[in-house]
Amino acid sequence: LNMLEPVGETLASEYPYXK
């Protein structure tokens, strides 16, 4: 699991890094 680069849509939604 990459906290800096979430490859999962669910992860990106819960943890919008960079966005």
From Swiss-Prot:
GO terms for molecular function: 4 iron, 4 sulfur cluster binding; chlorate reductase activity; metal ion binding. Optimum pH is 7.5. Binds 1 [4Fe-4S] cluster. It comes from the Bacteria. Its main location: cytoplasm. The keyword Metal-binding applies. One of its GO terms (cellular component) is cytoplasm. Its cofactor is [4Fe-4S] cluster; Mo-bis(molybdopterin guanine dinucleotide). Its EC number is 1.97.1.1. It catalyses: chlorate + AH2 = chlorite + A + H2O. It is found in: Cytoplasm. Heterotrimer of alpha, beta and gamma subunits. This is Chlorate reductase subunit alpha. It comes from Stutzerimonas chloritidismutans.
